[in-house]
Amino acid sequence: MKKYKITFIVLLLTLVGCSDLEENPVGILAPESFFKTTADLQAAINGSYASMSTESFWGRKLTLTLLLRGDLADIGDQGTSGRRKEVNNFTMGDDNGMVSAFWPQAYAIIGTANQAISNAGLINDDENKVNAVAAQAYFCRAFTYYHLVRLFGDIPYIDFAVSDASEIDAISKTPENEVYEGIIADLQYAKEWLPDTQFSRALPSKATAAAYLASVYLTRGDFQKAAEEAQFVINNEARFDLRLEPDFQNLFDANQTAGLKEPLFTIDYMGQISSSGYGQDYVASVTGIRGDATHEYGEGWSVAVPSLKVYQDWDAKDYRRAVSLDTTATSKSGEVYPYTQFEEYSDLAVNRPHIAKYYRYAGLAGNNGRESSTNYIPMRYAEVLLIAAEALNEISAGSSEAVSYVNRLRERARLGSGSMHPLNISEGLLQDELRNIIIEERKIELAFEFKRWYDIKRLKLGNEVFGPNGLEPQPNFDANRDYLLPLPGPELVRNSNLMPNNPGY
């Protein structure tokens, strides 16, 4: 769905933030005056999708936070804003500007979804049809809370339509376990009612809900259920119109992604759209090479740049490295130069390979790659295979099925490179050996796709990956503090029921 049709009326249904929730007007139209048809219900849900695509959520603030918090992307341009450095260096406080931007935007997504869910009963239409549309709202709510709970732990959990901010002025935090219960319930509803396929990957399907259930169960350590949900998707590839794309590069080409079969869910951008922050994508900009004149949309900003060790430790024969990282740039005179000379062409660049997944083929885009036409893929079929592999190995050490799923991804990588690398893994491995291989495969296959921090957190890898021998040593990392972000300080000032903040903040 390349364009979200958001009317002023729909935007008025959105209530954002948390304690005072920076209320947008909600009383212009009563719900019973708006929600009359399934088209009205869909229009309201489209408000959630639009809120996902804003600069303050997927367009930069949330995604850049996830990139920098992991060990695959470091700060490049040292003159970039302090709030980004704080996220990267584990020195952030409760006044961090990244968090204060995506926190209220997340609750805007949730608020719009709640309006749709609460008012679906007003629609006079076939119940099955209404439920199938409403299931999208359940998915949007679960998707957003799944990000929040992993980042913050205990959070306010609002699952009802808010018509007056006073209803939640004194809301308290909900324990993490209860938030997960709500997420699972929403995804189960979505899995039951969503169709097998949609006309666009920007709309969730039954397989999307199952894939996220698998991810949630894996995060919770329920390996049996994680395997069941992942294999439900895998065993029904044809039914759900899924496959691994033959060419890994096509997953990160804005001109290709709309027709791909691998994505289970996408967040779409139109290109050169910048009205009120909706549809604004800056991920290409912040990851692109400063001083590079290769693309007509201009140079990047060299903000989030992998450490040199990320490039050096990555098997040079693995096609995924060539797709994931740019090692050359082009001067204004047309000269192609290597990453070792990036700083010669811009004082703000750094002599390290840059993330290529978003900047290389940004499609129709504004200056510096802003406002690209990229379809970002929060969940794709490759990850489902990796979830199944990890869960099956935990259930049955060295599972041959787990090995086969990993090898499917390696085979795809070999097709791209035309070489024998990466080699297949063999059966008969010990559980720890296969576990380490699968986690490494996740790191490589899903590099820079906003997953790595969540893996570091759930596996408690912080001391290892941020230690002296890690890809990105971070001496400030504190395992007692840094697996959670701080709740925004102003929210706690306005509502003391949200106190105390997370430990260490």
UniProtKB/Swiss-Prot annotation:
Physiological role: Polysaccharide-binding protein probably involved in ulvan degradation. Ulvan is the main polysaccharide component of the Ulvales (green seaweed) cell wall. It is composed of disaccharide building blocks comprising 3-sulfated rhamnose (Rha3S) linked to D-glucuronic acid (GlcA), L-iduronic acid (IduA), or D-xylose (Xyl). The SusD-like protein may mediate ulvan oligomer-binding before transport in the periplasm for further degradation.
Keyword Lipoprotein: yes
Entry annotated with the keyword Lipoprotein: yes
Record-level GO cellular component terms: cell outer membrane
Protein name: SusD-like protein P2
Signal peptide: 1-17
Compartments in which it is found: Cell outer membrane
Predominant location category: membrane
PROSITE patterns: PROKAR_LIPOPROTEIN
InterPro entries assigned: SusD-like_N, SusD_RagB_dom, TPR-like_helical_dom_sf
Membrane topology: Lipid-anchor
S-diacylglycerol cysteine lipid attachment residues: C18
Family: Belongs to the SusD family.
Inducing stimuli: By ulvan and rhamnose.
Lipidation, N-palmitoyl cysteine type: C18
Natural source organism: Formosa agariphila (strain DSM 15362 / KCTC 12365 / LMG 23005 / KMM 3901 / M-2Alg 35-1)
UniProt keyword terms in alphabetical order: Cell outer membrane, Lipoprotein, Membrane, Palmitate, Signal
Classification lineage: Bacteria, Pseudomonadati, Bacteroidota, Flavobacteriia, Flavobacteriales
